[in-house]
C-alpha cells in the first residue's frame, strides 16, 4: 500500500521525539525538584511544623516545570499534521530542537530548584531571615526553565518555514 504522506517519511519521527523529549525531561526535572525539596519540607516540619505551609513554595515551583514541557509538547504535536501540509526534515529537526531546549532547561531548573529548596527550607527553620534569599534564588532557577520555554516556542515556530507557500 502506497503512502499518501507528502514530505520526508522520517521527519515526523523527529517531531514526535521532540514532543516526547520536552515532556519527559521537563517532568523529570519537576519530579526531582518536588522530591528533593519535599524531603527538606518533611524533615523541617518535624522541628517547626508552623513553617510547613510557608515552605512548600519550592515544591510548587518545581511542579510548574512539567507544565512548560506540556505546553511545548502540545505545540509540537499540533504542528505535525501530514495530511494538511507536507512535513519535511527541517520541520522535524526544528521540533526536535524545540523539545530538547525546553526539556533540558526544565530538567536543569528542576535540579536547581530541588537542591536550593531542600537546603533553603532547612535553613529557614533555623534562621527565618533566609526565606527571601531562598525565594530569589528559586526565581532565578525557575527563569532557566522559562528561557527554555521561550526558545522552544521560537524554534517550534520555525517549522514550516523551509518551503515557500
Swiss-Prot record:
Pfam family, one: ATP-synt_C
Highest taxon listed in the record's lineage: Eukaryota
Main location group: membrane
Key words, A-Z: Hydrogen ion transport, Ion transport, Membrane, Transmembrane, Transmembrane helix, Transport, Vacuole
Lumenal compartment spans: 1-12, 77-95, 156-165
Tissues in which the protein is found: Expressed in leaf, root, flower and silique, with lower expression in roots.
Keyword Ion transport included in the entry's annotation: yes
One GO term describing the cellular component: vacuolar proton-transporting V-type ATPase, V0 domain
Segments crossing the lipid bilayer: 13-33, 56-76, 96-117, 130-155
Annotated site residues (Essential for proton translocation) in this chain: 142
Protein topology in the membrane: Multi-pass membrane protein
Subcellular localization(s) per the UniProt record: Vacuole membrane
Residues exposed to the Cytoplasmic side: 34-55, 118-129
InterPro entries, sorted: ATPase_proteolipid_c-like_dom, ATPase_proteolipid_csu, ATPase_proteolipid_su_C_euk, F/V-ATP_Csub_sf
Primary role: Proton-conducting pore forming subunit of the membrane integral V0 complex of vacuolar ATPase. V-ATPase is responsible for acidifying a variety of intracellular compartments in eukaryotic cells.
Record text on subunit structure and interactions: V-ATPase is a heteromultimeric enzyme composed of a peripheral catalytic V1 complex (components A to H) attached to an integral membrane V0 proton pore complex (components: a, c, c'', d and e). The proteolipid components c and c'' are present as a hexameric ring that forms the proton-conducting pore.
Annotated family: Belongs to the V-ATPase proteolipid subunit family.
Protein name stated in the entry: V-type proton ATPase subunit c2
